Regions:
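Catalytic His-Asp segment of secreted/periplasmic serine-dependent ester chemistry enzymes
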Residues: 7, 120-205
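Conserved SGNH/GDSL esterase-like catalytic core that processes O-acyl groups on lipids
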Residues: 2-7, 15-99, 138
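Short hydrophobic segments within beta-strands
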Residues: 9-10, 117
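Hydrophobic positions in alpha-helices of CheY-like receiver
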Residues: 101-105
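Short, flexible active-site-adjacent loop segments at beta-strand->alpha-helix junctions, enriched
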Residues: 12, 82, 120-123
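A short helix->loop->beta-strand "cap" motif at the edges of active sites that frequently abuts
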Residues: 108-113
């Protein structure tokens, strides 16, 4: 039986940035990211199409310019919003780009199931360098939930995952309070794999 293919769209939390202690805006990308661990959890092939620092509008440009191969994808996961730009009260360019990205992917990967993922926990603790991301991540979470309902696509609400919280930030997000480290990405993949098995038992029975 051929391995299932999961394409992972996103920003630094997909690409696998661990962050740097006490510093903001410096990439520290590692191989052991959530797609790496998800492949092991589900015994599938994952393709990591994450790009650090991108909002939805910037990611749409990147997607269109790079001809990312989606043709044989069984599942496409989209986890964007950490870098802001979204609003639930007015139309913004990132809002429109996020919705357009879904449509483009549905066209490019006709057999794929699309899963939207809310950005996961960001600390509010000012001791961590990237705590300030929390404000726009909260808006993005609400935006993604709304889009999943409007577009009738699957949603993994990572923001509600109870294992990621203000207590465990010192374990899973210990460098900057935003990016995860190896243990965090592994736990994220475990959570995602459980949800994917619930959604698609016929694929991962």
């Amino acid at each position: 039986m051929e391995k299932r293919v999961i394409c992972c769209i996103g920003d630094s939390l997909t690409e696998g940035d661990y962050g740097v202690y006490g510093v903001t805006g410096v990439a520290n990308v590692h191989e052991k990211n959530y797609p790496y661990f998800l492949a092991k959890e589900l015994k599938c092939e994952t393709r990591n199409y994450g790009r650090c620092g991108l909002r939805a509008d910037q990611y749409l440009d990147y997607y269109m310019e790079n001809n990312l191969d989606m043709s044989d994808a069984d599942i496409v996961m989209i986890m964007l919003g950490t870098n802001g730009g979204h609003s639930v009260t007015e139309d913004t360019v990132p809002n429109e780009s996020y919705k357009k990205l879904i449509k483009v992917i549905q066209k490019d990967a006709p057999k794929a199931k699309v899963i939207l993922v809310t950005p996961p926990h960001v600390t509010a603790n000012p001791e961590f360098a990237n705590h300030w991301y929390r404000t726009h991540v909260e808006v993005s979470v609400e935006f993604v939930r709304n889009v999943a309902e409007q577009e009738d696509v699957y949603l993994i609400d990572a923001a509600k995952y109870e294992e990621f919280n203000e207590e465990t930030v010192k374990i899973y997000q210990k460098n900057d309070g935003l990016h995860y480290v190896e243990e965090g990405y592994q736990e994220m993949a475990r959570f995602f794999s459980r949800k994917i098995k619930e959604f698609f038992p016929e694929m991962f029975g």
